[in-house]
Amino acid sequence: MKIGVIGAGSWGTALANVVAANGHDTTLWAYEPELVTGMAATRVNHLFLPGIELHPGLNYTGALAEAVSGAELVLLVTPTQVMRNLLADLAGSIAPTAILASASKGIELGTLCTVSQICCQVLGDAVRERFVALSGPTFAKEVALGLPSLIVAGSANDAAAHTVQAAFSNPVFRVYTSDDAIGVELGGAVKNVIAIAAGISDGLGFGHNTRAALITRGLAEMKRLGRAMGAQDATFAGLAGMGDLVLTCTGDLSRNRTVGVKLGQGLTLEVIMAEMRMVAEGVKSAESVNALAQKLGVEMPITQKVYEILYGNKPARQAVLELMSRDLKPEQA
């Protein structure tokens, strides 16, 4: 199968490496010209995945049209906030029968659209039947190192989901399918916001009890938003929900948790972001997910407090204490 991967950050590079190692004709597009040149010369992504040699069959390009020309599967792995403009540039080059998959995890600012909704708006509603959301508890570095990992491919089209499953699966990378694309997308977006909250708690030194509570109540927020968007509760109990949430809230490789830890330790967002080369999607998602929750009338208090810390200059300790002093009520999923 001919596959084009758009986005050579750590996650895009790791996924491109998986399908190339599986024997597929794979081309990875990178925005940075020096990254294309460097990967072609050394087979290492020195910017985003240093120290890991990539499969010799993986091809590299800085030309979008070249990356997707003749591709039967196009995988989008860029920050959500640049997705719309990128798709507009790709529109004339993607084959009308190509499966369009996304491993990006976020909600677009302003429009409050998921990636699938952006794809339909830019490329036409027919894309919905060819769209697959790819998400799960996976750190790019561990996938690139060949450590056993599991992920889920969600699509309204069972055949499209199974095509992606077959393309990516191997003895150390197992792919499940789901018919709940919107649930898979939302799980990936919301968990990044909750991971910032968990990191803030850790940075404040609040301990394991607090983190466990944030993860559990964060899952409840994820499910409430999912119901309002037409997702299935079961999705959030699986790899794209609880699985990814636990990993991102506890793993030291989590960029979003790292942002939270530093916020809890007293650093400003500006200083934190200036130190980071790679994107922490949760910073933008806190704004868009909070706005989406307000638009749909969904109660998401943890998400709201993360938003207030990031964009309202609310002290982190005060935000956590405000969560603890909310009206007492029965536990609701």
UniProtKB/Swiss-Prot annotation:
PROSITE patterns from the UniProt entry: NAD_G3PDH
Catalysed reactions, semicolon-separated: sn-glycerol 3-phosphate + NAD(+) = dihydroxyacetone phosphate + NADH + H(+); sn-glycerol 3-phosphate + NADP(+) = dihydroxyacetone phosphate + NADPH + H(+)
A UniProt-annotated Pfam family: NAD_Gly3P_dh_N
GO molecular function: glycerol-3-phosphate dehydrogenase [NAD(P)+] activity; NAD binding
Compartments in which it is found: Cytoplasm
Protein function: Catalyzes the reduction of the glycolytic intermediate dihydroxyacetone phosphate (DHAP) to sn-glycerol 3-phosphate (G3P), the key precursor for phospholipid synthesis.
Membership in a protein family: Belongs to the NAD-dependent glycerol-3-phosphate dehydrogenase family.
Protein name as catalogued: Glycerol-3-phosphate dehydrogenase [NAD(P)+]
Protein species of origin: Trichlorobacter lovleyi (strain ATCC BAA-1151 / DSM 17278 / SZ)
Lineage: Bacteria, Pseudomonadati, Thermodesulfobacteriota, Desulfuromonadia, Geobacterales
Gene assigned in the entry: gpsA
